[in-house]
């Protein structure tokens, strides 16, 4: 459950280390985002010579949450951190590698690139 002002780790090699959610996209008064939802973020920590700079505003897709994902069979998949993958304006990943596991809930037409780059899909 990601909301405004939530800090997330970045799970790709775009150069950002930490981002902060500034808006949950989709709906006029939408409060929370879960795995697979697109949010607007600002970069709070970045490495030198990365593709993104501190203070930059971008879109991101949530790939891991501490709250977890409930599956139709009743199982629950939780993670140790909240993480996101940065997207460009065409909603394609900025980085070329994904770090850590991602869930099958991303397996839509929009995020197949993230699924294929991920080392582990739960």
UniProtKB/Swiss-Prot annotation:
GO molecular-function terms, A-Z: large ribosomal subunit rRNA binding; structural constituent of ribosome
Stored Pfam families: Ribosomal_L14
Keyword Cell membrane in record: no
GO biological process, one term: translation
One GO location term (cellular component): cytosolic large ribosomal subunit
UniProt xrefs under InterPro entries: Ribosomal_uL14, Ribosomal_uL14_bac-type, Ribosomal_uL14_CS, Ribosomal_uL14_sf
Assembly, per entry: Part of the 50S ribosomal subunit. Forms a cluster with proteins L3 and L19. In the 70S ribosome, L14 and L19 interact and together make contacts with the 16S rRNA in bridges B5 and B8.
Reported function: Binds to 23S rRNA. Forms part of two intersubunit bridges in the 70S ribosome.
Similarity annotation: Belongs to the universal ribosomal protein uL14 family.
PANTHER family: 50S/60S RIBOSOMAL PROTEIN L14/L23, LARGE RIBOSOMAL SUBUNIT PROTEIN UL14M
This protein's name: Large ribosomal subunit protein uL14
